[in-house]
Amino acid sequence: MSVEVDGFNASPLFKELHEGLADKSKAEEAVKAVNAVIVITLKNKEGKEQSWVLDLKKAGTLAKVDGAAPKGDVQLILKDVDFVKLANNKVNGQKLFMNGKLKVKGNMMKATAIESVFKKLDPRPKL
């Protein structure tokens, strides 16, 4: 199942994350580290909203949501462009939150784990 959505700059990142979680050892490591279901809801420049569910509680999977976002342990709500910056370590999640660009619903501590997940599953070479 594809996790990419036309019109969202974050689509390639979700594809990389999905492929990274296909590695069972990486998925198990992420589940151990996070132990939460994270719902990520993004809004693109056209104002369209799309959600993805990152299940790091049991399955270690990522899925695109069709329709309303389900309830998870934590929900991150932000603009598509800000999520791309967050995933690429160009901006800190705390800074986005403090500036009102990131809304968090649910377990705030679990929300901080998302940055570590991207670092662990990043396929790009470490310099």
UniProtKB/Swiss-Prot annotation:
A molecular function GO annotation: lipid binding
Top-rank taxon: Eukaryota
SUPFAM superfamilies reported for this sequence: SCP-like
Keyword Ubl conjugation: no
Compartments (UniProt record): Peroxisome
S-S bonds: none
Keyword flag Amino-acid biosynthesis: no
Xref: InterPro entries: SCP2_sterol-bd_dom, SCP2_sterol-bd_dom_sf
Record keywords: Lipid-binding, Peroxisome
Induction of synthesis: By alkanes or fatty acids; repressed by glucose.
Gene3D superfamilies the record matches: SCP2 sterol-binding domain
Pathway field: Lipid metabolism; fatty acid metabolism
Any Gene Ontology CC annotation: peroxisome
GO aspect biological process, one term: fatty acid metabolic process
Region (Hydrophobic): 33-41
Hydrophilic: annotated span: 43-52
Pfam families on file: SCP2 (PF02036)
SCP2 domain boundaries: 14-119
Assembly and binders: Monomer.
Task performed by this protein: Is involved in beta-oxidation of long-chain fatty acids. Its exact function is unknown, but possesses a nonspecific lipid-transfer activity, despite the absence of a cysteine residue thought to be essential for the activity of its mammalian counterparts.
Name the UniProt record assigns to this protein: Oleate-induced peroxisomal protein POX18
